[in-house]
Amino acid sequence: QEEFTAITENMSEGFLVIDQETRVLTYNSAVLRLLYAQVPTEEGESVYALNREAGFRRCVEEALAGRRCEQLLEKDDDCRQIIASPVEQDGQIAGAVLVILDVTEKEQRERLRREFTANVSHELKTPLTSILGTAEILQNGLVKPEDVPHFAGNIHRETERLIGLVNDIIKLSRLDEGGGLGQWETVDLYEEARAVLEQLAPAAQRKQVTTRLQGGEALVRGVPQIVEEIVYNLCDNAIAYNRANGSVTVTVENTAFGPRITVADTGIGIPREAQGRVFERFYRVDKSHSSGGTGLGLSIVKHAAAYHGAAVELESDEGAGTTITVIFPKPDAKARP
């Protein structure tokens, strides 16, 4: 009995044994935590003193009727899985064994997977529908010759959007897996920012946004392509969600905490209630999609920064612009290879 108690008390799962009359025979302390029981239950008391939810009761009743039962119990943001199995003795149901698991993280991952799948389906469908509709109009000869370049331009634009989306999904998948992203090297954040702003100059010109780079050399350890993704997506977002005659200021500097890059814009800003969600996949403050993009840029920043052990900070007010800062570990700090 002492060995049995020692084993069950060291389990993170809840373990509970009841008899045919639903009386508690034994349980470990994890049961109280996982079933949100306010006070311990004495042996011989009804198991329903631990939890009175309908799902829990159904599981107990099914097991005592001779049928194995699984049930999810949700409370606030927590999720528990109840697995109840009948116990037979001399051909009769003598009771049941219940195992309670904390599956909160598993269910959250599954929810995120479902949301991601639904979002991907929607985001892919939009440009594909546009491409198909335009192609059908061209195929049926419903376009004047002089209008063909315009319709062809629509197809080209939507195709580029589709390719961008697929590329961003691939990047996020690789970051999720965390391996095979490339060799770690010493990277100059200032040089990366300079190259990115040069690359984005045409986009900034189209949006009538001026860009400025200030600071100096700041060396970090990381995968060059992934560090570039961080800088590119920060600057691209700052330009895309800016206003005409707005500005983007990129500051690169060394601090006591480590190399830091800050991207500040004079754009539309982010409402306070949305600031906790802007790093989610496909989340957009601009629901009209008028600013373009895939809705994955800041999610890539978040995951790429985490891969490098970097911290991300956001400051914003609606209508007053946004400032995002990424602070990398010092190059001599212990990090990935």
Where are these regions (language model features)?
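Short conserved segment of the HATPase_c
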Residues: 270-282, 302
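Short acidic helix/loop segment immediately C-terminal to the autophosphorylated histidine
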Residues: 139-146
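PAS-family sensory/regulatory modules and their coupling/dimerization elements
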Residues: 43-105
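Conserved glycine-rich
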Residues: 309-310
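Conserved micro-motifs of the catalytic ATP-binding
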Residues: 177-183, 215, 219-225
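Short alpha-helical segment of the dimerization/phosphotransfer core of two-component systems
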Residues: 157-162
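Sensory modules in modular signal-transduction proteins
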Residues: 1-24
